């Protein structure tokens, strides 16, 4: 059974189809949330709430996007709400930096991994989220804009500023060759 068929059956109340959808997409949601929160404990809370919201709102899902994108959007919103409530940003885990980059590949290859993480952790959530979605999960700008509920131009600007900040900070620390 393909994803669209599972979605239609889940919308009709088929618990088995919904369970299959959630099981297939759980690793993607979990990986993203752990990376964005940096804390397995916080991630567990966000994931549980996101899955609950997905179950309760399955009939509202519009299959124009992938189911995993919808789950990540819900998870992002849950975490964003949590940040608003707690007014603190949780650091990222050290496994956030992916090995394969596009334009940043040269810059990233010259830097100390830990320093990049420290710099990334000091940035606002919005910039971190864009960086993670683009470079770790290889989402397109349009998909990131939908997930974060902002214009594509804002996504591009946040990513550009994030990379610019990383480069600037590394130059300041005299780590660029």
Where do the PLM segments sit?
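A short, charge-rich alpha-helical start-of-domain segment used by transcription regulators
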Residues: 7-31, 128
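Arg/Lys-rich amphipathic alpha helix in sigma70-family domain 2
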Residues: 59-62, 73-93, 161
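DNA-recognition helix of helix-turn-helix
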Residues: 80, 127, 146-173
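A short pre-motif secondary-structure segment
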Residues: 130-134
């Amino acid at each position: 059974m393909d994803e669209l068929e599972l979605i239609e059956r889940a919308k009709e109340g088929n618990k088995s189809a919904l369970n299959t959808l959630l099981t297939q997409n759980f690793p993607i949601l979990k990986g993203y949330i752990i990376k964005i929160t940096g804390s397995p404990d916080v991630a567990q809370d966000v994931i549980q709430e996101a899955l609950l919201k997905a179950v309760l709102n399955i009939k509202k899902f519009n299959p124009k996007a992938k189911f995993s994108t919808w789950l990540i959007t819900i998870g992002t919103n849950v975490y964003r709400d949590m940040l608003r409530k707690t007014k603190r940003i949780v650091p990222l885990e050290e496994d956030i930096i992916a090995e394969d980059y596009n334009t940043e590949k040269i810059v990233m290859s010259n830097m100390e991994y830990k320093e990049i993480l420290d710099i990334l952790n000091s940035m606002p959530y919005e910039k971190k989220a864009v960086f993670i979605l683009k470079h770790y999960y290889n989402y397109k700008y349009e998909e990131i804009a939908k997930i974060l509920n902002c214009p594509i131009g804002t996504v591009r600007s946040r990513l550009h500023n994030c990379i610019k900040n990383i480069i600037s900070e590394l130059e300041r620390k005299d780590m660029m060759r």
